[in-house]
Amino acid sequence: MDERPNLIHGIFLRCNGIAAPMKFCIVCGLYYLCIVQRKIIHIDMDAFFASVEQRDDPTLRGKAIAVGYDGPRGVVATASYEARRYGVHSAMAMSKAKRLCPHLIVVGGHYARYKEVSHQVRDIFADYTDLIEPLSLDEAYLDVTVNKKDIPLAVDIAKEIRQRIREELHLTASAGVSYNKFLAKIASDYRKPDGLCVIHPDRASDFIARLRIEQFWGVGPKTAERLHHIGVFTGAELRQLSEHHLQELFGKMGPILYQFARGIDHRPVVTEWQRKSVGCEHTFATDLTDPSAIATEIRRTVDELLGRQRKADFEGRTLTLKVKYADFTQITRSMSADHALTTKEQILPLAEELSRGINEGQKAIRLLGLTLSNPITTIAEPTGARWVEQWLPFEDT
């Protein structure tokens, strides 16, 4: 057998998310698999909505701006980095954002424009690979293990993509490069904004050991609090817990945390999928009993839901209200329309109708949530697709 078999370009298999090029033995005439380590890039546009507004309106550049509804119950969809220095962040009540940053400029938002720019970004991605998994309008995973330009180093592809986004679209993006999705996502957050971070396999263990537990993908405030309670604050401390112990504490989330702490994540980059739903919910520090306070929270949650819906580019026809009471009993109510629910004028009346009588008898409410589902179109998913949404119980952060 020839010890230097020729690589047959364009012929490869997908096995558990790993790109497996086929090599050919010129003596025996057989193909065989060469399993290679994956090269995953996570691209995240920097303050996307706000950056598009600043790019298109020179008077906004260098100023603290927030995209969202400028009303007493408005919610911040995205804040510029100038505004973030004052503590303003997405999902914050606009009234609070203005208190933190009195000179904040509120922009209503141009969502058709954001969608157009998002497609331009994805066109750039497509020059390098067809294995693209959009997570929202402003972020995506790319598997460049086998890429269209035969560039051997994923970091060079990430550099090219960031440069093209800057030169062609006049925006900035942060990129994370590693051998799986978990680490690539963490890496893209590590040097924001306008940053590039690579986590090499031989340095992944030390990198994870130093991470704060809050930086682990899928760990929200509630999970972090429980981990802190048992003395776990870093990746190194998480690694000391057995898989069985973590499963006892967190159910299905336990084995996932066990693997993440060791840099293991076999999820593939999935190209054909459709988000099933978009939602948000809030647990209150003090249970709600006053009808006016409940109505205020319903309106605030609608505003936040609209922001998430637009960011995810999602259109659904069914609105579901979730209510959890102080005694931990729970109800859900749903209403459907024959068209997409995409505006406040469409969603708020349904939310108010669903919430009628939910605190009958002054029953104290601990949690309120709203979810949009029943998407307009359906895209067939390959087996095992969207492992994160189907298996991993992400918390609302």
Describe these PLM feature segments.
Residues 9-249, 254-256, 372, 376-397:
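Gly/Gly-Pro- and Ser/Thr-rich, intrinsically disordered tail segments characteristic of DNA damage-repair
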Residues 34, 42, 215, 223-367, ...:
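DNA-contacting surface of Y-family translesion DNA polymerases
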